[in-house]
Swiss-Prot record:
Biological processes, Gene Ontology terms: negative regulation of vulval development; regulation of DNA-templated transcription; regulation of transcription by RNA polymerase II
GO CC field: autosome; condensed nuclear chromosome; DRM complex; nucleus
InterPro entries: CRC, Lin-54_fam, Tesmin/TSO1-like_CXC
Amino acids binding Zn(2+) 2: 177, 191, 198, 201
Entry comment, domain topic: The CRC domain mediates DNA-binding. It contains two CXC subdomains (joined by a flexible linker) which are both required for efficient association with target DNA. Each CXC subdomain coordinates three Zn(2+) ions.
Known partners and oligomeric status: Component of the DRM complex, at least composed of lin-9, lin-35, lin-37, lin-52, lin-53, lin-54- dpl-1 and efl-1.
Functional summary from the UniProt entry: Synthetic multivulva class B (synMuvB) protein. SynMuvB proteins are required to repress the induction of vulval development by Ras signaling and probably act by forming the multiprotein DRM complex that repress transcription.
Protein name as it appears in the record: Protein lin-54
Length: 435
């Protein structure tokens, strides 16, 4: 029998060999099937119509002949055989595609992938469109027009951010104005109120420049007619005596909720205390409040030690040393975080404050001493080069500054101790001068 004609039976086909042997042993009648004698079995005749049954019978008869020695057994050929494969089943594959309406919505499309046996890759895959990239601001980069709109909008947003970005100004640098309707000819324009021309400002339709000199002069005359002190500085200097010099606000502030501890309070920004001219509410920008808070924080105990440390540092400083320390109120920036309850103002002797002794005469005398040391260093004959003269001059000036500061601290401490020991019946009113 040709091995190439062997057909494997399906899973549902079966062949019961026990019935054949039982009939053969009992001497049942044989019938001729395809030129061969096989036991007669009605059940086997019903199975002959099924695919693969006749081949199975032929194979069984051949095995019987081999056992009886009628047919010689030959080696099995290892050539290929025909195999019945079950028909391919349709495979469903889910592909994700974004919805056309909203960028965040999604749809699922089911595609039947058939004809698996004919495709080399076993799958008839249709080209699926990739999800489109969703651009910011809801713009899709589908074509050139949308890309152009997106670029224009991005540039516009960048320009707005750059324009509204907070700028940092150097100390002493004037802030630009932002006038839009006053033409910078009103007193609420900082440039016009300070008697300066607008420069590098953000104002619109500006007339505060040399091109509109006639209109600017007319606006100045009108302002002076209404208020002769219109262009005077807001922070003025009043002299009540020979040594009583105070800096105060000309009109006073009108703060209500900040406690006069914010930079939009003109008194606080100018480093001057509020006075009776101010109409503020809940004011805490006073010397009494400053000293009370400083004592509660424990700074009054180490006040003298800190000043003496500054004196020693300035006396031993050299040009190679870094920038020296500056004595400041370490808790000055924490006023906003450590607000005390509002208390009635208590009158104190101004002679207890350190700024009381920093008069113009003391500053002038200390300056003259340092200038004399500088001249002496420049006229020093042993020093040959200019660099050595400058280095020596800096050393002598710093040493003289430390000596003057130490002398002022010593005298101030002695006078303060005398005030604590001696009772004072007449205490002058609180002074508003600062250093």
């Amino acid at each position: 029998m040709n091995q190439g004609e062997i057909v494997y039976q399906d899973d549902d086909d079966y062949y019961d060999e026990s019935e054949i042997y039982d009939n053969y042993e009992e001497g049942a009648e044989f019938i001729e099937v395809n030129g061969q004698l096989v036991p007669h079995n009605p059940n086997l005749q019903a199975q002959q119509n099924r695919p693969g049954t006749s081949s199975m019978i032929q194979q069984h008869n051949r095995s019987m002949e081999v056992n009886q020695g009628l047919v010689k057994d030959e080696p099995i050929d290892t050539s290929s055989h025909r195999v019945y494969v079950p028909p391919p089943r349709p495979v469903q594959r889910k592909l994700f595609q974004p919805g056309p309406s909203t960028p965040g919505s999604s749809q699922y499309t089911v595609r039947n992938l058939s004809n698996l046996s004919g495709s080399p890759s076993m799958y008839d895959r249709q080209p699926a469109s990739l999800p489109r990239t969703v651009q910011p601001m809801g713009l899709e980069m589908g074509n050139s027009e949308q890309r152009k709109v997106y670029i224009d909008m991005k540039d516009h947003v960048s320009h707005i951010r750059l324009k509204t970005k907070k700028k940092v100004f150097a100390p002493g640098q004037r802030k630009p104005c932002n006038c839009t309707k006053s033409q910078c000819l009103k007193l609420y324009c900082d440039c016009f109120a300070n008697g300066e021309f607008c420069r590098d400002c953000n104002c619109k339709d500006c007339h505060n420049n040399i091109e509109y000199d006639s209109q600017r002069s007319k606006a100045i005359r009108q302002s002076l007619e209404r208020n002769p002190n219109a262009f005077k500085p807001k922070i003025g200097i009043a002299r009540g005596g020979i040594t009583d010099i105070e800096r105060l606000h000309q009109k006073g502030c009108h703060c209500k909720k900040s406690g006069c501890l914010k930079n939009y309070c003109e008194c606080y920004e100018a480093k001057v205390p509020c006075t009776d001219r101010c109409k503020c509410k809940g004011c805490q920008n006073t010397e009494t409040y400053r000293m009370t808070r400083y004592k509660n924080s424990g700074g009054a105990v180490s006040n003298t030690n800190a000043l003496m440390s500054l004196t020693n540092a300035s006396s031993t400083a050299t040009p190679d040393s870094g920038p020296g320390s500056v004595v400041t109120d370490e808790h000055g920036d924490d006023y906003e975080d450590m607000l005390l309850s509002h208390k009635p103002k208590v009158e104190m002797d101004p002679r207890r404050f350190p700024w009381y002794y920093m008069t113009d005469e003391v500053v002038e005398a200390a300056t003259m001493c340092m200038v004399a040391q500088a001249e002496e260093a420049l006229n020093y004959e042993k020093v040959q080069t200019e660099d050595e003269k400058l280095i020596n001059m800096e050393k002598l000036v710093l040493r003289e500054f430390g000596r003057c500061l130490e002398q002022m601290i010593t005298n101030t401490t002695e006078l303060t101790q005398d005030l604590d020991a001696a009772p004072t019946d007449d205490i002058p009113g609180p002074s508003t001068s600062t250093s």
